[in-house]
């Protein structure tokens, strides 16, 4: 698997690895271990493959929830950070296991103009998924979203913001 991940991947390669790991926890664990590889291409490609797992196989990553959060908080490479945020967005966030450090990270990235749009959008959605349990936290999220009024937003950021506002409004009905 490492050899395959050491080259530029096409979608057929990704699907082949997904099929290879389908229902095989040992191979998923090996693929996950490759996300730590020193070779940047291998680790990034391994994360990219995980983003293509179907929902059934994606559940295997639920046990890696806190590990993914820990890694996102310190990751320097934007591509890997974006891929890990994508993986976290596909996981449930339970009220009893929220992490304030990750909430703070997400709020900080929402308003950081220096961050890529994809990371800001993912952080917006992840912040909502964590903060929706508490009205006072939702108010903090609304304030962060209001701060975005001061800048010209990309269509993707506008859409993510609108989705959160609409979702929050529907929850109150």
Report the location of each language-model feature.
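Alpha-helical scaffold domains
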Residues: 1-173
């Amino acid at each position: 698997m490492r050899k395959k991940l050491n080259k530029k991947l096409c979608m057929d390669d990704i699907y082949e690895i997904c099929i290879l790991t389908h229902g095989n926890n040992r191979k998923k664990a090996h693929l996950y271990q490759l996300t730590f590889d020193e070779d940047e291409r291998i680790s990034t490609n391994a994360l990219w493959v995980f983003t293509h797992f179907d929902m059934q196989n994606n559940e295997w990553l639920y046990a890696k929830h806190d590990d993914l959060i820990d890694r996102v908080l310190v990751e320097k490479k934007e591509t890997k950070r974006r891929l890990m945020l994508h993986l976290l967005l596909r996981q449930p966030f339970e009220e009893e296991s929220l992490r304030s450090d990750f909430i703070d990270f997400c709020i900080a990235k929402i308003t950081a103009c220096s961050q890529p749009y994809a990371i800001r959008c993912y952080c917006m959605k992840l912040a909502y998924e964590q903060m929706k349990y508490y009205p006072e936290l939702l108010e903090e999220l609304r304030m962060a979203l209001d701060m975005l009024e001061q800048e010209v937003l990309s269509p993707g950021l506008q859409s993510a913001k609108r989705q959160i506002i609409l979702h929050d409004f529907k929850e109150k009905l």
